[in-house]
Every structure is written in structure tokens, then in C-alpha cells.
Regions:
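Contiguous, well-ordered beta-strand patches that form the walls/edges
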Residues: 65-136
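A short, sequence-level motif marking secondary-structure junctions
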Residues: 56-59, 122-125, 147-149
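N-terminal cationic leader/targeting segments used for protein routing and processing
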Residues: 3-4, 17-23, 28-34, 57, ...
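Bacterial Sec-dependent N-terminal signal peptides
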Residues: 4-5, 15-40, 139-141, 145-158
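A short gly/proline-enriched turn/hairpin at secondary-structure junctions
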Residues: 43-46, 62-70
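Sec-dependent signal peptide recognition
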Residues: 2-10
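Short, solvent-exposed loop/hinge segments that bridge or flank secondary-structure elements
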Residues: 34-59
């Protein structure tokens, strides 16, 4: 019996060791990602302007997209930068964030000092975000990529 237990423990140890040494085939970085993508709301807060949420390297920012010449003129005046139709421009940085991705790869939680956001249904072209502010109020946002909405990005104004 001692021999059996010894072999069982040895077998489990080897299995655990081999499981920890899985080859990284690079598939984890493929597929949809909530970070590094300009996420757009379909609604225009002002004529010719679309708001953009951008998450990258632990920094959450709001950008704006100039959908028309009128929107570009408005953004140029507001940001004091030269903005043309089709440009994306930083309007204001929001805060730092941390992200916890769920195992399914299409959902997770984004935590920041200004509140918490839960995302789900992540695809290459869209994501549903439920945002909770510090007072517990919620907002549901269906966000899309510009490519999906059919608008070209002609440049990013820093």
C-alpha cells in the first residue's frame, strides 16, 4: 500500500509539473481585447462629435471623434489643437485603472478611483459596459469600434 501511495503522489507531482510547463503558443493574446481599442458610443453628445472610451496601460481616457467638419471645428476650438474630420483627439484623461478578466475571455471588471465597470459580451467589434459610480448609480453603455460603425479614422491628435 505504501508503494501505491508513493507512486500516486509521484504521478500527481509530475502531472502538476507538466501542467505548469505548458507551451505558450501565443493564443492568449489573440481574440477580442477590451484594452487598446477605441470604444465609441453611437450617440453624439454634440453635432458631428462622438465620445470615445480608451483603456491602455492602466490609464483610462475619454477621446472624441470628429465625425464631420462641424465636429472637427468644435473640437479644434475646445482642445486648441488642429482637428480634422475623421480625427480622434484626447479630451480628458479619466483615471488609472486595474482590470480583472474573467476566464471566458469576454467579460471582466475594470476598477478605478472614479468607480467600477463590468464588461460583457466582448467581441472584436462591440462590448457592453455597466458602469457604477462612487454613489452606486449605474449606466449601461453599448460600445462599438469605428470600423464596425463605418467611420474611418484619419489620424490621432495628441
Amino acid at each position: 500500500m505504501k508503494k501505491f501511495i508513493f507512486y500516486a503522489v509521484a504521478l500527481l507531482s509530475v502531472a502538476s509539473l507538466l501542467n505548469g510547463c505548458k507551451k505558450d503558443d501565443g493564443n492568449e493574446s489573440k481574440g477580442p481585447n477590451v484594452e487598446g481599442v477605441f470604444w465609441f458610443e453611437e450617440e453624439e453628445p454634440a453635432p458631428g462629435v462622438m465620445m470615445v472610451l480608451y483603456l491602455k496601460d492602466g490609464n483610462m481616457s475619454y477621446y472624441a471623434y470628429a465625425k464631420s467638419d462641424e465636429g472637427a471645428a468644435m473640437l479644434s476650438e475646445e482642445t486648441r489643437k488642429i482637428v480634422k474630420k475623421g480625427n480622434i483627439v484626447l479630451t480628458f484623461p479619466l483615471s488609472a485603472y486595474t482590470i480583472v478578466k474573467n476566464e471566458d475571455g469576454t467579460s471582466g471588471t475594470i476598477n478605478s478611483p472614479i468607480g467600477k465597470m463590468e464588461y460583457s459580451g466582448l467581441t472584436e467589434n462591440s462590448v457592453l459596459i455597466v458602469a457604477y459610480d462612487s454613489e452606486g448609480e449605474t449606466a449601461r453603455l453599448q460600445l462599438y469600434t469605428l470600423e464596425y460603425l463605418g467611420f474611418p479614422v484619419t489620424g490621432i491628435v495628441e
